[in-house]
Swiss-Prot record:
Catalytic site: D13, N61 (proton acceptor)
GO molecular function, one term: magnesium ion binding
Family: Belongs to the UPP synthase family.
Record-listed E.C. numbers: 2.5.1.-
Source superkingdom: Bacteria
Transferase listed as a keyword: yes
UniProt xrefs under InterPro entries: UPP_synth-like, UPP_synth-like_CS, UPP_synth-like_sf
Positions of disulphide bridges: none
Subunit structure of this chain's protein: Homodimer.
The gene coding this protein: uppS
Protein known as: Isoprenyl transferase
Residues engaged in binding substrate: 14-18, 26, 30, 58-60, 62, 64, 175, 181-183
């Protein structure tokens, strides 16, 4: 296996706490978090890293207040519409993982529209985890299998049934905000990922912080089970 960095995944944690520290509503933290998304994805694109997957909205996030969920859905839709020029200027294409059918119809339509409009771009792919949970993803993949496939299934063929399909496994998984857990994010794809945890809240995370995480990754010895 190559140690070349092909796929970064990020659990973007800390928006709410960032806002609370400043006496602001949680919504302001989410808005500020989008600014971080733009600068980090631009940096990843400039570095020529093929994939970055962002944990935008989990299957568990529906447990939040109706007002916050509604705000987040609106923010996602607004962001996708507003950034088409950014994607074009940077040759970025958008992909989606998660249970698309479980999202409001207007969000489904916007995701499909942006995915179609950016599909010809050949640079970095931003993979948006929206209504995503690894357990849900794996269960949906199992349900796609017919009896013949089930009898001959192996790791490679099962991987293709997952939302990520042919996207390479995660090399570096970053979590901001101080927590040290995966939170049901890309469990199958992160089997051999290097984990990087930082106390910095997502809205405060900088391009320099990204470079530090990548430099730390480069120093790791990835053995993949070997001695």
């Amino acid at each position: 296996m190559s140690d070349e960095l092909k796929h970064i995944a990020i659990v973007m944690d800390g928006n709410g706490r960032w806002a609370k520290k400043r006496g602001l509503p949680r919504s302001m933290g989410h808005k500020e978090g989008l600014n971080t998304v733009k600068r980090i994805t631009k940096a990843v694109s400039d570095l020529g890293i093929p994939y970055i997957t962002l944990y935008i909205f989990s299957t568990e996030n529906w447990k939040r207040t109706e007002a916050e969920v509604g705000f987040l859905m609106g923010l996602i839709k607004q962001h996708l519409k507003a950034e088409l020029k950014f994607y074009a200027d940077n040759n970025i294409r958008i992909e989606h993982i998660g249970n698309l059918s479980g999202l409001p119809q207007d969000i489904q339509d916007e995701i499909n529209s942006v995915r179609d409009k950016t599909s010809a771009y050949t640079g970095t792919a931003i993979v948006l985890g929206i209504n995503y949970g690894a357990h849900d993803e794996i269960l949906r993949a199992i349900k796609k299998l017919n009896s013949d496939e089930l009898a001959s299934i192996n790791e490679e063929s099962f991987s293709l049934k997952l939302d990520t399909g042919k996207i390479p496994p995660v090399d570096l998984l970053i979590r901001t905000g101080g927590e040290k857990r995966l939170s049901n994010f890309l469990l199958w794809q992160s089997a051999y990922a290097e984990l990087y945890f930082t106390d910095t809240l997502w809205p405060d995370w900088t391009v320099e912080n990204l470079y530090e995480a990548i430099e730390d990754y480069k120093k790791r010895n990835r053995r993949y089970g070997n001695a």
